[in-house]
Structure formats: structure tokens, C-alpha cells
Regions:
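N-terminal/edge-of-domain interface segments
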Residues: 1-207
Length: 207
């Protein structure tokens, strides 16, 4: 039985959906970024993580050791934070993209968050032999700073608001690990994200 973090998945469906269609061509996270999720404190108006002009504070994230191009340890995996500068596109808003992943192993860890509510969806895992599997995921709203079941809180920081707003609040950044099974001998080539733009992905790694 696959698991997400420590959450066991028992009865979402008893139906066999059959084989999935071929996965779309994969791209790197660096080439897929399309959301300005992190802004510099000197120019908060450049960010828009949530569609309302709010974003993560680069200065606040740096206090957790999270910086552009830096390494972040998340649930036992070494992830690389996007190298793009604050105030430029530096996260992937999920639109069904297929993202390449490096390294080997049977677990995939994401650095992620959502806006306007928690996300329930499926992460498609694509293997080098051409087959794929789907695994249910749940990602919490950044506004809560409270990870979804099976996830972890990586950082909870003050946000940057659009100019003219003055409502200080802490927002969360989360880790989420999908385990394809220790007995899985297949090699993971890529992942395909759900088609829900509220979900943002900063990094992903296989381990």
C-alpha cells in the first residue's frame, strides 16, 4: 500500500482505471516556473503567489536558510530552491505540467503550498519504462501555516503584501513526500502535476 508521509491510503477507490496515456514531455522546474511566489522586501508589489498580490518574503525565508539556488532539507531529501531572483517567476503554478526529477529512489518529496484552500489531487509518477502511476496528495493553504495530513511545515514566515495593505500574517511552506513503495524496482523519470493552479511547487527530488 503506498503512503503519503505517515498517512496510509486505504479506500479512495476500488476501481482500476486502466493504463494511463503517455506522459507529456518533461521539462525542468527551472524552465517551468510561471509564478512570482517570492518577492524582495524592498519591492513586495512584484510578487503574486496567491492571485491577490501577496507573496513570500525573501528576507523571512532566508532566516530559515531558504535562499535562491540554495539547498533545503525537506523530509530527509535535499531539494534545491529555485535560483531565480525574488520578484521574478520562481515557482510552478500547477497546470498539469510534467517535471523531470533527478536521482534515484522510491520516494518523491515536494516543497510546496497552495492558496485559497487546501488542494486534493493526484500526482502522476512516470517511470523510465513508459508506465505511470497516480498517487493522491493533499497540500495545505499557505495562509494556515498548518500542514495537511502526511505533510510537514518547512517554514512559517511573515508574508509580503501588495502595496497599500497592512495586515501582518504568517504563511506556511510545506514538505510532502509520496512513497511509491520500497519494493518498487522501477526508475522514476518525471512527475505530472494536477491541473489546479492554486497548487505551487518550488522543488522536487527523488530519494
Amino acid at each position: 500500500m503506498p503512503s503519503v508521509g505517515n498517512m496510509k491510503l486505504f479506500s479512495l477507490s476500488t476501481d482500476n482505471p486502466g493504463p494511463l496515456p503517455p506522459a507529456p514531455a518533461a521539462q525542468s522546474i527551472a524552465s517551468a516556473v510561471n509564478n512570482v511566489a517570492v518577492s524582495d522586501d524592498s519591492n513586495p508589489g512584484a510578487g503574486d503567489f496567491d492571485g491577490s498580490g501577496n507573496s513570500y518574503s525573501a528576507g523571512a525565508l532566508a532566516k530559515y536558510g531558504i535562499t535562491a539556488g540554495g539547498k533545503v532539507t525537506v523530509e530527509g531529501a535535499q531539494l534545491t530552491f529555485p535560483s531565480q531572483s525574488p520578484g521574478t517567476a520562481n515557482a510552478v503554478a500547477s497546470q498539469g505540467q510534467t517535471l523531470s526529477v533527478d536521482d534515484s529512489g522510491h520516494k518523491i518529496t515536494l516543497l510546496t503550498a497552495s492558496n485559497d484552500g487546501d488542494i486534493l489531487g493526484f500526482l502522476r509518477v512516470n517511470y523510465t519504462d513508459g508506465t505511470s502511476e497516480q498517487f493522491p496528495i493533499e497540500v495545505a493553504d499557505w495562509f494556515s501555516s498548518n500542514p495537511a495530513p502526511g505533510g510537514s511545515l518547512v517554514a512559517s514566515t511573515a508574508w509580503n503584501q501588495r502595496p497599500g495593505n497592512n495586515s501582518p500574517h504568517a504563511v506556511g511552506l510545506y514538505g510532502l513526500t509520496v512513497d511509491t513503495g520500497a519494493s518498487n524496482a522501477k526508475t522514476i523519470a518525471s512527475i505530472t502535476l494536477p491541473s489546479d493552479g492554486r497548487l505551487k511547487v518550488f522543488s522536487a527530488a527523488v530519494h
